[in-house]
Amino acid sequence: MQRRKFLQSSLAATAGTAVGTNNTLTGNVPAASREIYEWREYEMRFGADQSQLENYFKTALIPALNRHGVKAVGVFKEWRPTDPAKFFVLTPYASLEQRLTIHDKLKTDQEYIKNSATYNSIPVDKALYSRFTSSLMLAFEGWPAITVPASAPRVFELRTYEGYSEDAVTRKIKMFHDGEFPIFQRAGLNPVFFGDVIAGDRLPRLTYLLTCANMEARDKGWAAFVADPEWKKLIGDSQYANTISKISNSFLAPTAYSQV
Protein backbone atom coordinates (compact mmCIF):
# COMPACT_ATOMS: atom_id res chain seq x y z
CA MET A 1 0.00 0.00 0.00
CA GLN A 2 2.84 2.41 0.88
CA ARG A 3 4.52 1.61 -2.45
CA ARG A 4 1.30 2.31 -4.30
CA LYS A 5 0.86 5.66 -2.55
CA PHE A 6 4.44 6.55 -3.40
CA LEU A 7 3.97 5.66 -7.08
CA GLN A 8 0.72 7.57 -7.27
CA SER A 9 2.15 10.70 -5.66
CA SER A 10 5.31 10.55 -7.77
CA LEU A 11 3.50 10.14 -11.09
CA ALA A 12 0.85 12.66 -10.11
CA ALA A 13 3.60 15.16 -9.39
CA THR A 14 5.09 14.51 -12.83
CA ALA A 15 1.69 14.87 -14.47
CA GLY A 16 1.03 17.97 -12.43
CA THR A 17 4.17 19.57 -13.80
CA ALA A 18 2.97 18.89 -17.34
CA VAL A 19 -0.47 20.30 -16.57
CA GLY A 20 1.04 23.36 -14.98
CA THR A 21 2.98 24.20 -18.14
CA ASN A 22 0.11 23.36 -20.48
CA ASN A 23 -2.80 25.05 -18.69
CA THR A 24 -2.25 28.17 -20.78
CA LEU A 25 -2.94 26.28 -23.99
CA THR A 26 -6.69 25.95 -24.20
CA GLY A 27 -8.30 26.87 -20.94
CA ASN A 28 -7.25 25.04 -17.79
CA VAL A 29 -8.40 21.48 -18.45
CA PRO A 30 -7.44 19.65 -15.23
CA ALA A 31 -5.44 16.43 -15.35
CA ALA A 32 -8.28 14.62 -13.57
CA SER A 33 -10.48 14.97 -16.66
CA ARG A 34 -7.82 13.72 -19.09
CA GLU A 35 -7.16 10.07 -19.77
CA ILE A 36 -3.97 8.20 -18.94
CA TYR A 37 -2.63 5.90 -21.67
CA GLU A 38 -0.39 2.92 -21.15
CA TRP A 39 1.46 1.81 -24.28
CA ARG A 40 3.23 -1.55 -24.20
CA GLU A 41 5.55 -3.02 -26.82
CA TYR A 42 6.31 -6.74 -26.82
CA GLU A 43 9.11 -8.15 -28.98
CA MET A 44 8.72 -11.90 -29.34
CA ARG A 45 11.64 -14.29 -29.11
CA PHE A 46 12.70 -16.05 -32.30
CA GLY A 47 10.57 -19.14 -32.77
CA ALA A 48 8.18 -18.31 -29.91
CA ASP A 49 4.54 -19.35 -30.23
CA GLN A 50 2.90 -15.94 -30.54
CA SER A 51 -0.58 -17.50 -30.42
CA GLN A 52 -0.03 -18.08 -26.69
CA LEU A 53 0.46 -14.37 -26.10
CA GLU A 54 -2.55 -13.53 -28.25
CA ASN A 55 -4.70 -16.05 -26.39
CA TYR A 56 -3.67 -14.37 -23.14
CA PHE A 57 -4.70 -10.98 -24.52
CA LYS A 58 -8.01 -12.31 -25.87
CA THR A 59 -9.16 -14.55 -23.04
CA ALA A 60 -7.56 -13.07 -19.92
CA LEU A 61 -6.16 -9.54 -20.08
CA ILE A 62 -8.72 -7.71 -22.21
CA PRO A 63 -11.82 -9.24 -20.54
CA ALA A 64 -10.36 -8.43 -17.11
CA LEU A 65 -9.59 -4.83 -18.05
CA ASN A 66 -13.11 -4.47 -19.44
CA ARG A 67 -14.63 -5.86 -16.23
CA HIS A 68 -12.72 -3.31 -14.21
CA GLY A 69 -13.86 -0.34 -16.26
CA VAL A 70 -11.51 -0.01 -19.24
CA LYS A 71 -13.84 0.45 -22.21
CA ALA A 72 -11.55 -0.26 -25.16
CA VAL A 73 -8.17 -1.99 -25.33
CA GLY A 74 -6.17 -1.79 -28.54
CA VAL A 75 -3.86 -4.59 -29.68
CA PHE A 76 -1.79 -4.10 -32.82
CA LYS A 77 0.80 -5.86 -34.95
CA GLU A 78 3.25 -4.30 -37.35
CA TRP A 79 1.74 -3.37 -40.72
CA ARG A 80 4.66 -5.13 -42.38
CA PRO A 81 5.62 -7.94 -39.99
CA THR A 82 9.21 -8.43 -38.92
CA ASP A 83 10.90 -11.44 -37.35
CA PRO A 84 10.70 -11.69 -34.42
CA ALA A 85 7.15 -10.37 -34.34
CA LYS A 86 6.08 -7.38 -32.25
CA PHE A 87 2.81 -6.65 -30.47
CA PHE A 88 1.59 -3.29 -29.22
CA VAL A 89 -1.06 -2.83 -26.52
CA LEU A 90 -2.90 0.44 -25.84
CA THR A 91 -4.86 0.71 -22.59
CA PRO A 92 -6.73 3.97 -21.92
CA TYR A 93 -7.50 4.63 -18.26
CA ALA A 94 -9.89 7.26 -16.96
CA SER A 95 -7.27 8.36 -14.43
CA LEU A 96 -3.98 7.44 -12.81
CA GLU A 97 -5.97 6.19 -9.83
CA GLN A 98 -7.83 3.73 -12.06
CA ARG A 99 -4.52 2.45 -13.47
CA LEU A 100 -3.15 1.77 -9.99
CA THR A 101 -6.41 0.29 -8.71
CA ILE A 102 -6.68 -2.17 -11.60
CA HIS A 103 -3.04 -3.17 -11.14
CA ASP A 104 -3.94 -4.29 -7.62
CA LYS A 105 -7.30 -5.84 -8.50
CA LEU A 106 -5.88 -8.15 -11.16
CA LYS A 107 -3.78 -9.86 -8.50
CA THR A 108 -6.94 -11.16 -6.79
CA ASP A 109 -9.33 -11.39 -9.76
CA GLN A 110 -10.10 -15.11 -9.77
CA GLU A 111 -11.47 -15.16 -13.31
CA TYR A 112 -8.37 -13.40 -14.60
CA ILE A 113 -6.13 -15.77 -12.64
CA LYS A 114 -7.97 -18.79 -14.06
CA ASN A 115 -7.86 -17.48 -17.63
CA SER A 116 -4.16 -16.63 -17.28
CA ALA A 117 -3.17 -20.09 -16.02
CA THR A 118 -1.90 -21.43 -19.36
CA TYR A 119 0.04 -18.24 -20.06
CA ASN A 120 1.58 -18.23 -16.58
CA SER A 121 2.60 -21.89 -16.83
CA ILE A 122 4.88 -21.33 -19.84
CA PRO A 123 8.33 -22.60 -18.77
CA VAL A 124 11.40 -20.39 -18.80
CA ASP A 125 12.96 -22.23 -21.74
CA LYS A 126 9.88 -21.46 -23.84
CA ALA A 127 9.49 -17.80 -22.82
CA LEU A 128 7.54 -15.83 -25.41
CA TYR A 129 9.48 -12.58 -25.05
CA SER A 130 12.46 -11.29 -23.09
CA ARG A 131 10.76 -8.18 -21.70
CA PHE A 132 8.14 -5.66 -22.74
CA THR A 133 8.55 -1.89 -22.60
CA SER A 134 5.87 0.36 -21.17
CA SER A 135 5.18 4.09 -21.11
CA LEU A 136 2.50 6.22 -19.49
CA MET A 137 1.01 9.26 -21.20
CA LEU A 138 -1.27 12.06 -20.10
CA ALA A 139 -3.83 12.99 -22.77
CA PHE A 140 -3.52 16.46 -24.28
CA GLU A 141 -5.89 19.10 -22.95
CA GLY A 142 -7.31 19.65 -26.42
CA TRP A 143 -7.85 15.92 -26.99
CA PRO A 144 -8.59 14.59 -23.50
CA ALA A 145 -10.06 11.19 -24.42
CA ILE A 146 -9.40 8.47 -26.96
CA THR A 147 -11.37 8.48 -30.22
CA VAL A 148 -12.17 4.88 -31.17
CA PRO A 149 -12.43 4.50 -34.97
CA ALA A 150 -15.04 2.43 -36.77
CA SER A 151 -14.30 -1.28 -36.81
CA ALA A 152 -13.15 -1.60 -40.40
CA PRO A 153 -9.86 -2.57 -42.06
CA ARG A 154 -7.44 0.30 -41.54
CA VAL A 155 -3.85 1.32 -40.95
CA PHE A 156 -2.64 3.09 -37.82
CA GLU A 157 0.37 5.38 -37.64
CA LEU A 158 2.12 5.79 -34.30
CA ARG A 159 4.25 8.94 -34.25
CA THR A 160 6.73 9.99 -31.58
CA TYR A 161 8.39 13.40 -31.32
CA GLU A 162 11.44 13.73 -29.08
CA GLY A 163 12.61 17.14 -27.91
CA TYR A 164 16.00 18.35 -26.71
CA SER A 165 14.39 19.76 -23.53
CA GLU A 166 11.13 19.78 -21.60
CA ASP A 167 10.42 23.28 -22.88
CA ALA A 168 10.83 22.16 -26.49
CA VAL A 169 8.20 19.43 -26.06
CA THR A 170 5.89 21.84 -24.18
CA ARG A 171 6.12 24.29 -27.08
CA LYS A 172 5.36 21.50 -29.56
CA ILE A 173 2.30 20.50 -27.54
CA LYS A 174 1.20 24.14 -27.62
CA MET A 175 1.59 24.06 -31.41
CA PHE A 176 -0.89 21.17 -31.59
CA HIS A 177 -3.38 23.16 -29.54
CA ASP A 178 -2.84 26.34 -31.54
CA GLY A 179 -4.04 24.83 -34.79
CA GLU A 180 -2.87 21.32 -35.66
CA PHE A 181 -5.94 19.40 -34.48
CA PRO A 182 -8.31 20.83 -37.15
CA ILE A 183 -5.62 20.46 -39.81
CA PHE A 184 -5.44 16.73 -39.10
CA GLN A 185 -9.21 16.47 -39.41
CA ARG A 186 -9.38 18.46 -42.65
CA ALA A 187 -6.63 16.28 -44.11
CA GLY A 188 -8.44 13.05 -43.26
CA LEU A 189 -5.73 11.96 -40.81
CA ASN A 190 -8.00 10.71 -38.06
CA PRO A 191 -6.53 11.15 -34.55
CA VAL A 192 -7.02 8.39 -31.98
CA PHE A 193 -5.06 9.96 -29.11
CA PHE A 194 -2.39 12.51 -28.29
CA GLY A 195 -0.20 11.82 -25.26
CA ASP A 196 2.38 13.75 -23.26
CA VAL A 197 4.73 10.98 -22.09
CA ILE A 198 5.16 11.23 -18.31
CA ALA A 199 6.95 7.92 -17.68
CA GLY A 200 9.02 5.78 -20.01
CA ASP A 201 12.17 5.90 -22.07
CA ARG A 202 13.55 8.56 -24.44
CA LEU A 203 12.14 11.49 -22.47
CA PRO A 204 11.12 14.20 -23.04
CA ARG A 205 8.75 13.23 -25.83
CA LEU A 206 5.15 13.10 -26.99
CA THR A 207 3.35 10.33 -28.85
CA TYR A 208 0.17 10.26 -30.88
CA LEU A 209 -1.79 7.77 -32.97
CA LEU A 210 -3.56 8.42 -36.28
CA THR A 211 -5.65 6.13 -38.46
CA CYS A 212 -6.68 5.98 -42.11
CA ALA A 213 -8.51 3.50 -44.31
CA ASN A 214 -5.30 2.46 -46.08
CA MET A 215 -1.78 3.63 -46.92
CA GLU A 216 -2.96 5.54 -49.98
CA ALA A 217 -5.35 7.58 -47.82
CA ARG A 218 -2.55 8.14 -45.31
CA ASP A 219 -0.18 9.47 -47.99
CA LYS A 220 -2.88 11.75 -49.44
CA GLY A 221 -3.68 12.96 -45.95
CA TRP A 222 -0.13 14.01 -45.17
CA ALA A 223 0.18 15.73 -48.54
CA ALA A 224 -2.95 17.73 -47.69
CA PHE A 225 -1.65 18.45 -44.19
CA VAL A 226 1.65 20.00 -45.26
CA ALA A 227 -0.12 22.01 -48.00
CA ASP A 228 -2.71 23.47 -45.60
CA PRO A 229 -2.37 27.28 -45.29
CA GLU A 230 -2.84 27.11 -41.52
CA TRP A 231 0.06 24.67 -41.25
CA LYS A 232 2.28 27.02 -43.21
CA LYS A 233 1.39 29.80 -40.76
CA LEU A 234 2.20 27.61 -37.76
CA ILE A 235 5.62 26.50 -39.00
CA GLY A 236 6.49 30.12 -39.76
CA ASP A 237 5.91 31.13 -36.13
CA SER A 238 9.25 31.55 -34.36
CA GLN A 239 7.92 30.31 -31.01
CA TYR A 240 7.74 26.81 -32.50
CA ALA A 241 11.31 26.73 -33.81
CA ASN A 242 13.50 23.82 -32.67
CA THR A 243 10.71 21.95 -30.91
CA ILE A 244 11.52 18.50 -32.33
CA SER A 245 14.93 16.86 -32.45
CA LYS A 246 13.80 13.41 -33.62
CA ILE A 247 10.65 11.99 -35.24
CA SER A 248 9.92 8.27 -35.41
CA ASN A 249 6.86 6.49 -36.72
CA SER A 250 5.50 2.96 -37.01
CA PHE A 251 2.68 1.58 -39.13
CA LEU A 252 0.38 -0.80 -37.30
CA ALA A 253 -2.55 -3.08 -38.07
CA PRO A 254 -5.23 -3.93 -35.49
CA THR A 255 -5.61 -7.56 -34.50
CA ALA A 256 -8.97 -9.23 -35.07
CA TYR A 257 -9.79 -8.89 -31.36
CA SER A 258 -8.56 -5.30 -30.90
CA GLN A 259 -11.20 -2.95 -29.47
CA VAL A 260 -9.51 0.11 -31.03
Summary of predicted features, one role per range:
Residues 34-45:
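Acidic/histidine-rich, surface-exposed loop or edge segments in extracytoplasmic proteins
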Residues 43-53, 59-68, 72-147, 165-167, ...:
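Hydrophobic, ordered structural segments
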Residues 139-215:
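Surface-exposed interaction/gating patches
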